Amino acid sequence: MLAPDTFWLACLEYFENELSAQQFNTWIKPLRLQLSDDSPEPALRLIAPNRFVLQWVKDNFLSDITQMAENHFARPVQLQLELAGQIPASASPSTGRNNGTASHSITAVFDAPTESAQKAPKDTKDTKDAKEKQEKNPTRLNPSFTFNTFVTGKANQLARAGAIQVAERPGVAYNPFFIYGGVGLGKTHLIQAIGNFVVEQNPAAKVRYIHSEQYVSDVVRAYQHKAFDEFKRYYHSLDLLLIDDIQFFGGKNRTQEEFFYAFNALIEAHKQVIITCDSYPKEIAGMEERLISRFGWGLTVAVEPPELEMRVAILLKKALMEDIILDESVAFFIAKHIRSNVRELEGALKRVVAYSRFTGHALTLDLAREALKDLLAVQNRQISIENIQKTVADYYKIKVAEMYSKKRSRVVARPRQMAMAISKELTPLSLPDIGEAFGGRDHTTVLHGYRKIAELRASDPAVNRDFNTLLHILRG
């Protein structure tokens, strides 16, 4: 007779040590392990809360878990990966340290399919001009923002995977779907890709993409013209509502109240709500608690600044789309020096291409250096390790000299790790060079500090906020 309790606890401990906190809480912690009562051979059921987790575990972790089971029980063990809704009612209680409680980061809220849209409100005098513009593109979606044109890397792979799941099953998979991250990291592209996919699959779907400031303007107009009934009929009748940069709702009480009603109406009707923000939901200034709590009902994912390989891929794909012949060495040069976000990356590419066309010279590595020399000179002058150390020390209220010291107390070690991580992010220096600038430390110490901050950013919104704030300060 198999005893799964001890095995699953060992499994949880292994993955908790191997994965980041976000990965562990998202993929492993929600799983439940049960004995299989209807199999002639020794068998275990590994139960996933939804299809998204099931597929991800199958692709990335199932072979490891199976191998650990065979090592633990010292014999072949059949491991069945199943969806929670497929488990018989007589199944035995779940085992594991989470006591069967699934992680709140992923929740499959609804099972019913999206219903057909209601009729849109009739035109009024005050909305006639706006309606005429909307008739050309009522969704307000950019048709070039698709999943095919979205470059995927470690920084956004979870967000993209969730977006595809939502696009394929709107109102069923994760509702709401909340994406947060800094400026220019692809949040708008990703949510509009969902909208374009939904419209392609169902042209009759009533989809609306809107920036939060435009939504605020709609609320103001409805208030001025006493047209809240029509406002509500329109927004409550959507099949898919995509709200961009919801942080601008902060402090706007009437807007938040109307959005609260719209949010509830759409969720109750099994219609999809998708939101982007520049910060984690609980960190949004001036946002009502009742909205913040609802943002956590579905899936919340972060997008991070792209890593080097992803930046190169973005440049090459952009060049291909624009019929630009771009050598990989030129793409690598641009990507190595432009690290902040996708918009600045594409801006640098446009600058290099324009310089090539104006001068009539081929787009070579030397030309790229010449075209970007002013930009790179400003970056090199402003963002040095010394500047990073001083900025981080001032931020955490410690002495700059403590960056080089041997002190290991948390009040000094954490800022030092933060400065090392930012140095790796913002400078082209190697790990040994960064270590040398921090009191002659070994490159492995720098790498450990970088990974530690990355792990904390995934699990602690305060650390992530500090990191992004410092990047913003240093970049000016």
Swiss-Prot record:
Q: Name one Pfam family in it.
A: Bac_DnaA_C
**Domain comment quoted from the record:** Domain I is involved in oligomerization and binding regulators, domain II is flexibile and of varying length in different bacteria, domain III forms the AAA+ region, while domain IV binds dsDNA.
Q: Name one GO cellular component term.
A: cytoplasm
Q: Where is this region: Domain III, AAA+ region?
A: 140-356
GO-annotated molecular function: ATP binding; ATP hydrolysis activity; DNA replication origin binding; lipid binding
Q: What is the official name of this protein in its record?
A: Chromosomal replication initiator protein DnaA
Tell me the SMART domains matching this sequence: AAA, Bac_DnaA_C
Tell me the compartments it is located in. Cytoplasm
Q: Which organism is it from?
A: Nitrosospira multiformis (strain ATCC 25196 / NCIMB 11849 / C 71)
The Basic and acidic residues compositionally biased stretches are 120-138
Region ranges (Domain I, interacts with DnaA modulators): 1-75
The ranges of region (Disordered) come to 110-141
Renumbered to this chain, region (Domain IV, binds dsDNA) spans: 357-476
Write down the InterPro entries for this protein, in alphabetical order: AAA+_ATPase, Chromosome_initiator_DnaA, Chromosome_initiator_DnaA-like, Chromosome_initiator_DnaA_CS, DnaA_C, DnaA_dom, DnaA_N_dom, DnaA_N_sf
**Alphabetic keyword roster:** ATP-binding, Cytoplasm, DNA replication, DNA-binding, Lipid-binding, Nucleotide-binding
Q: Which GO terms describe its biological process?
A: DNA replication initiation; regulation of DNA replication
Instruction: Read off the CDD domains from this record.
Output: AAA, Bac_DnaA_C
Q: Which residues bind ATP?
A: G184, G186, K187, T188
- State the function annotated in the UniProt record: Plays an essential role in the initiation and regulation of chromosomal replication. ATP-DnaA binds to the origin of replication (oriC) to initiate formation of the DNA replication initiation complex once per cell cycle. Binds the DnaA box (a 9 base pair repeat at the origin) and separates the double-stranded (ds)DNA. Forms a right-handed helical filament on oriC DNA; dsDNA binds to the exterior of the filament while single-stranded (ss)DNA is stabiized in the filament's interior.
PROSITE patterns (UniProt xref): DNAA
Which protein family is named in the record?
A: Belongs to the DnaA family.
Subunit structure, as described in the record: Oligomerizes as a right-handed, spiral filament on DNA at oriC.
**Chief localization:** cytoplasm
Ranges for the region named Domain II are 75-139
